[in-house]
Amino acid sequence: MKPFDIKAKRPLIISGPCSAETEEQTLETCRQIAATGLVDVLRAGIWKPRTKPGSFEGVGLKGLAWMSKARELTGLPIGTEVATSKHVEAALEFGVDVIWVGARTTVNPFSVQDIADALKGADVTVLIKNPMNPDIELWSGAIARMQNAGITKLGLIHRGFSAYGASLYRNNPMWHLAIEMRSRFPELPMICDPSHICGCRTYLQEVAQKSADLDYDGLIIESHICPDKAWSDASQQLTPDGLEALLRSIVWRRSTTDSPSYQQALAKLRSQIDQIDAEIFELISKRMRVAEQIGLVKRDNNVTILQGGRWQSIVDRVVSQAPKLGVSTE
C-alpha cells in the first residue's frame, strides 16, 4: 500500500465503528463500509477515554490486530485515537496510517507533549481534535507541539465543544472557532466530526452539509453494523447503508471558480458588504460615545451602571423587530 497522503483527496472520508468490540464486528463493519466505495480511511476506537469509570474502555492491542486485518481485507488505510506514548508505540508497531489526538487529550499540554515526543521521526499522519473547552490556544498549541516534533503530515478535526446547559447538540459546534483555526493554519486540512457534534443520528446530515458549505476538507463519521447494540455511543452511529445514504446526500462545492460572470457578481456584492460594514462601524462608534455620556450622567448622579428594566426593554424591542427585518431572534 502507498503511504497515506491526507491532502491527496477531497473530500476525505474517515469512517468505522466508535469502538472495535469483537473481531467479527470490526471486520464486517469495515468490509461493508469499504464496499460503499465512498470511504478513504477505516477507523475504530482501540482505547476509549470515557467520562466515567466502569464504561467500556476499549479492547486494547487485539483491536489493532483486527484493524490490520481490515486493512488487508479492504486495501484501505486505518486510523485510531491515541492518548499516551504507549498508545503511539503500539499504533506505530501495527503500522497505523492515521492517528488522532482526542478532545480529552488536547486539553492537557503535558499529554500532548508526551505524544509528540513519542512521534518524533515517525512518518504518520496526525490529526488534532479540538479541546473539550472552547480554548483555541490549546488547539493551536497542540499543533505547534507536533510541528516542533517534526511531524509534517498534520490535520485538524472539529468535533464541537462542551457547553453547560441544554443544547441541540451533544457538543456545541461553535463554527467560528474552527473558522479561526483555518485562518491560523490554512495549509492544514479541516475534517468535521458530526458524530460527536450531534451525539445522535438526527442532525448528522445537517451538520455534515454545513461543514461542506464552509469548505471543510472531509468528514469523520462513526458507523457500525448494528448501531443500537454498540458498546459505546450507540445513538450517534450509522449503519453502513445509512452512512452511504448520508455521504451521497452531501453536496461538496468548489472553493471558487474562474467564471467571469461569477467574479463580477461577487465583486459587486462584496463592495456593497464593505460599504455596509463601514456604515455599521460608524454607527457603533456613535452609539458608544452616547453610551459613555450616559455613564457619566449616571456617575454624577450616583446611579448604578446597569438598570435591568432598561436593558430588558432594549432586548425585547430588538427581538420583536428581528422577524420584520428577516433577522434571526437568536
Tell what function each PLM region has.
Residues 6, 111-245, 255-258:
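Catalytic alpha/beta core domains of metabolic enzymes, predominantly
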Residues 11-28, 52-57, 77-82, 102-104, ...:
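Active-site mouth loops of central-metabolism enzymes
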